[in-house]
Amino acid sequence: MKALWALLLVPLLTGCLAEGELEVTDQLPGQSDQPWEQALNRFWDYLRWVQTLSDQVQEELQSSQVTQELTVLMEDTMTEVKAYKKELEEQLGPVAEETRARLAKEVQAAQARLGADMEDLRNRLGQYRNEVNTMLGQSTEELRSRLSTHLRKMRKRLMRDADDLQKRLAVYKAGAQEGAERGVSAIRERLGPLVEQGRQRTANLGAGAAQPLRDRAQALSDRIRGRLEEVGNQARDRLEEVREQMEEVRSKMEEQTQQIRLQAEIFQARIKGWFEPLVEDMQRQWANLMEKIQASVATNSIASTTVPLENQ
């Protein structure tokens, strides 16, 4: 039984470990007609419309219309996910209790991450509405630019976690179909060759050493798998935080540069206003002085010419 579930889980775990290297696409792979996927598609369509930041979007963002619509779509999606998970639990065949609990825990964690992503998106749009309403007619271009950047990042995170949830539900569904269609006898028949191979290996290795070795290998594999998932999630979260911090620093630097430029222009205008009257006054005084000097020189020249004439 464990070997069967190990075969089912290997592709899922491989995909999870590769998430950090693959670019998140715009659509979920392998979509079906499940109600929860249809509800999620409606959420995607609405989010794509919000990301256009058209005039209508801007108008509705300034009210509570967008957040109300998102709330309804979020609740519909999570309700359908819970219903589908419950349906699979009821169909799940006679698998080991440990396997059942582990799968349920993984699906629950993926479901919680997707719900948290949706909640973060709604809160960010509410924050944007508050910021726009406080601008009171001022330019909101910078706010729209930052919102557009945040929406792209949030959409990537949503797609990543939605894809993860879909993969884990697929594994859950595989177990349910196996139990519903074939039952215990079919599973035993399928596992017969594996059991026989295990017995042969046990005979070769020794009855006392084979089972503890397999148990230790299984435990080590579980620990490594869990640790790799934990490290991968932490690394992705940290990278996202660093990117957001760098974006905020860049925005602040641009804002400060603009402020410094404006202050320099204002100071230059003030300096010009201070010195222009002084320069004009000095020019007038200099012109008056030159006129007086020229008049004095002319008077002296006339006087010098008149005196010799009188002496004659």
From Swiss-Prot:
Spans annotated as Lipid-binding and lipoprotein association: 202-282
Q: Pfam families in the record, alphabetically?
A: Apolipoprotein
What residue spans carry the region label LDL receptor binding? 150-160
Question: What GO cellular-component annotations does this UniProt entry give?
Answer: cell surface; chylomicron; chylomicron remnant; dendrite; discoidal high-density lipoprotein particle; early endosome; endoplasmic reticulum; endosome
Chief subcellular site? Answer: secreted
Quaternary structure annotation from Swiss-Prot or TrEMBL: Homotetramer. May interact with ABCA1; functionally associated with ABCA1 in the biogenesis of HDLs. May interact with APP/A4 amyloid-beta peptide; the interaction is extremely stable in vitro but its physiological significance is unclear. May interact with MAPT. May interact with MAP2. In the cerebrospinal fluid, interacts with secreted SORL1. Interacts with PMEL; this allows the loading of PMEL luminal fragment on ILVs to induce fibril nucleation.
Summarizing the function annotation, the protein's role is:
APOE is an apolipoprotein, a protein associating with lipid particles, that mainly functions in lipoprotein-mediated lipid transport between organs via the plasma and interstitial fluids. APOE is a core component of plasma lipoproteins and is involved in their production, conversion and clearance. Apolipoproteins are amphipathic molecules that interact both with lipids of the lipoprotein particle core and the aqueous environment of the plasma.
Keyword list, A-Z: Chylomicron, Endosome, Extracellular matrix, Glycoprotein, HDL, Heparin-binding, Lipid transport, Lipid-binding, Oxidation, Phosphoprotein, Repeat, Secreted, Signal, Transport, VLDL
Q: Which organism is it from?
A: Rattus norvegicus (Rat)
Q: Which residues carry this modification: Methionine sulfoxide?
A: M135
Record protein name field:
Apolipoprotein E
Per the UniProt entry, the signal peptide is 1-18
Modification comment: APOE exists as multiple glycosylated and sialylated glycoforms within cells and in plasma. The extent of glycosylation and sialylation are tissue and context specific.
sequence repeat boundaries on the chain: 72-93, 94-115, 116-137, 138-159, 160-181, 182-203, 204-225, 226-247
